[in-house]
Amino acid sequence: MSSLSLTSEKFKKNYTSSFKLITRVKPFKDSLEYNLEVTNEGMEYLNQLDSNLIGIISIIGPEKSEKSFLSNLILGDIAAFDSSKPSTDIYMWGQPIAQGENTDLLVLDTEGLYKPINSKTNFDKQIFILSCLTSSVMIYNTNDTIQDCILKFTSLAKESLSCIKKIEGKDLTSTDLPLVYFV
């Protein structure tokens, strides 16, 4: 991990911590469903990126599976994400990690999946789809056994990918999808 270098000189605003990149918004007052929206701060941040190549690592998994802790380890244990309380929405570390002259790496810490309240909505699918379509690498972090983890992941992936197929009107190929690691 010592080869990572944080590149704070790139930005007008000094991002020295994680911030909410994507938040959930109710489309109307009494809705059980939520839409995901990029926050104003997130949009400002993304507009400042000037790398030719950006790699994105998304950490997904069940609630209370230590996704924030794993995100901090990937960043070199700098306590970028608050792992003392459950994350809501999607957070991103405020500095891209330089991986070469024109390549940066971004780390996303997502809200936990499989919450009882989310069983009545499509929120888990939205988190999965967003992670799937934007990431170079998706890490599924879990406290379950790998067998249970793969069963849950496969079920969510099947539902989510069928939603993508409906929207895109075509099957996704392996080049359209991120690498997936189970931790």
Regions found by a protein language model. Give the residues of each.
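N-terminal switch/interaction subdomains of large nucleotide-dependent motors and GTPases
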Residues: 1-183
